């Protein structure tokens, strides 16, 4: 198993991190029963150290927020220069820094059995991990961090550098008298692994995964430089715009002001069968839980309030293991599909325009779609791959552009989410909503940090764009004839016709382009 990730640390504000670009090579490890016991003991020691440091960090954070200095700083206006100075003094006074909590973690390690299992650098990185969790909570970037239980244990450990602690030496991992050899890809037909192993190792990370109810251990080598791009993944130097939805993506690309390609796709289209299996197992688990604990439920089927004692049968635990495996498969499938789709997008263009969306809002309003399709994860993968290929993902504000409500003739009509087609009553243009928004996004320009739509350029390119948008919708209709497609595509049940059925060509006049154009729709 070979996984390559890319991380551009140029965008990180942490001054302690290296500012050079890095990428990750993940390799499975050959682990004996004895090695597995040692690794599990070290991960358990790290879990207990993490909980100890996290508890101390939350305690210091609580005392700091209760102090009079902190309350006074909060009462100051945001533009007051003394505000940040007082906050900084409070942090130093209550020892709520990464260095102070690393020192506390080192004392905990040296005062108990943890020192027999963890080296200094690994303990310091574990303490830093706990501090960052508390710091995110301090800045309201996440909720209150939870302690790691045995059932949700710590599954990764890393070192600070390749000089000590977890080290990659020659062709194996060395860690406190523990030597672990990886399983290398002997074929390596794209040369990705060979390129990675020739790069400088910054530090190493040990990962524990549960696959098919068995523990597997992997090493992640954080390497300096850029990963090798596979020869089959071609990169285009054109420009494109994408319109992202909770479960769909629309793309329109152009080359030298000539519209080149367009498509409308669904994220992870084959995830439906996995979701069906997950639902079946969840229903079976619920039935088992109700039969084993009849006294814990009210007459209407709801769970009783208060402290309850639950009994779980062996059958329930087996179903729980199957459910966990299905979720792992779904996550791996989703990540693979997003990587493939990102490569397809980059084969169309490496300069990609996109609306700046709130993916947290997607989570609140379309929770199931986001859980299964993860549009925010796709954008992060696309951004990483685009930067690696020398391109960029440019996000523009939706407040001034309003692409889903705007026509190229200048008419602005607010549409409901259920209205999936753009039909302009003034110029007569009809197009699928997502595709048309992606088309207009190609002509968004930045004027003094204000994004606006260049209507004249959009009108000039419409003659070449309309046939491509029609072709993209024709492909969607062909797919809809064989399987169900998302409702957001705007393809109704009557449009899911067999390919032999005739199509109706509707002639209309396009007012802004002053010529006759045709629109093909299924009868």
Residue ranges of model-derived segments:
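Acidic carboxylate diad motif detector
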Residues: 78-212, 372
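Positively charged, helix-rich recognition surfaces that bind polyanionic ligands
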Residues: 15, 217-523
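A generic secondary-structure signal for well-formed alpha-helical elements
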Residues: 50-61, 134-141, 248, 289, ...
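Generic detection of short hydrophobic beta-strand segments and adjacent strand-loop junctions
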Residues: 23-29, 180-186, 260-265
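Stable alpha-helical structural segments in soluble proteins, enriched in small hydrophobic residues
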Residues: 53, 125-137, 435-445
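Short flexible coil/turn linkers enriched for glycine and charged/polar residues
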Residues: 21, 212-215
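Gly/serine-rich nucleotide phosphate-binding loop at the start of the catalytic core
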Residues: 2-124, 522
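Non-catalytic, well-ordered alpha-helical scaffold segments
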Residues: 37-40, 44-47, 51, 121-128, ...
């Amino acid at each position: 198993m070979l996984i390559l990730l890319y991380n551009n640390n140029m965008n990180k504000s942490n001054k302690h991190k290296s500012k050079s670009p890095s990428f990750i090579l993940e390799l499975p490890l050959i682990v004996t029963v004895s090695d597995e016991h040692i690794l599990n003991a070290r991960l358990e020691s790290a879990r207990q150290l993490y909980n100890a440091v996290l508890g101390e960090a939350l305690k210091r954070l609580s005392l700091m927020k209760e102090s009079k200095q902190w309350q006074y700083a909060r009462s100051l206006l945001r533009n007051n220069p003394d505000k940040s100075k007082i906050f900084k003094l409070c942090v130093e006074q209550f020892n709520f820094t990464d260095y102070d909590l690393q020192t506390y973690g080192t004392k905990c390690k040296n005062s108990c059995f943890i020192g027999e299992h963890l080296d200094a650098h690994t303990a310091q990185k574990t303490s830093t991990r706990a501090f960052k969790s508390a710091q995110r909570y301090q800045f309201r970037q996440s909720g209150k961090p939870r302690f790691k239980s045995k059932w949700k244990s710590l599954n990764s450990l890393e070192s600070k550098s390749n000089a000590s602690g977890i080290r990659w030496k020659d062709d194996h991992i060395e860690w406190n008298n523990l030597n672990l050899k990886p399983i290398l890809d002997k074929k390596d037909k794209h040369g990705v692994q060979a390129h990675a192993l020739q790069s400088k190792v910054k530090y190493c990370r040990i990962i524990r995964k549960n696959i098919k109810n068995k523990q597997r251990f992997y090493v992640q080598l954080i390497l300096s430089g850029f990963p090798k791009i596979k020869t089959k993944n071609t990169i285009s130097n054109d420009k494109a715009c994408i319109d992202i939805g909770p479960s769909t993506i629309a793309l329109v690309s152009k080359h030298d002001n000539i519209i080149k390609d367009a498509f409308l796709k669904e994220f992870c289209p084959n995830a439906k069968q996995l979701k069906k299996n997950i639902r079946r197992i969840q229903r079976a688990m619920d039935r088992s839980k109700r039969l084993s604990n009849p006294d814990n439920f009210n007459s209407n089927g709801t769970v009783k309030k208060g402290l309850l004692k639950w009994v779980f049968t062996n059958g329930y635990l087996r179903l729980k293991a199957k459910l966990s495996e299905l979720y792992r498969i779904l996550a791996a499938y989703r990540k693979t599909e997003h990587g493939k789709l990102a490569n397809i997008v980059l084969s169309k263009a490496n300069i990609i325009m996109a609306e700046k969306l709130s993916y947290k809002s997607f989570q609140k309003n379309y929770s199931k779609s986001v859980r299964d399709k993860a549009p925010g994860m796709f954008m992060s993968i696309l951004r990483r791959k685009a930067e690696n290929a020398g391109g960029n993902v440019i996000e523009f504000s939706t407040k001034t552009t309003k692409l889903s409500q705007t026509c190229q003739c200048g008419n602005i009509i607010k549409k409901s989410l259920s209205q999936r087609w753009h039909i302009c009553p003034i110029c007569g243009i009809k197009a699928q909503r997502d595709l048309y928004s992606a088309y207009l996004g190609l002509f968004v320009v930045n004027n003094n940090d204000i994004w606006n739509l260049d209507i004249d350029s959009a009108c000039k390119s419409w003659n070449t764009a309309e046939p491509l948008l029609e072709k993209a919708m024709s492909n969607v209709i062909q797919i809809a004839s064989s399987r169900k497609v998302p409702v957001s595509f705007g393809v109704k049940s009557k449009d899911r016709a067999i390919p032999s059925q005739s199509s109706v060509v509707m002639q209309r006049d396009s007012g802004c382009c002053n010529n006759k154009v045709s629109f093909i729709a299924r009868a």
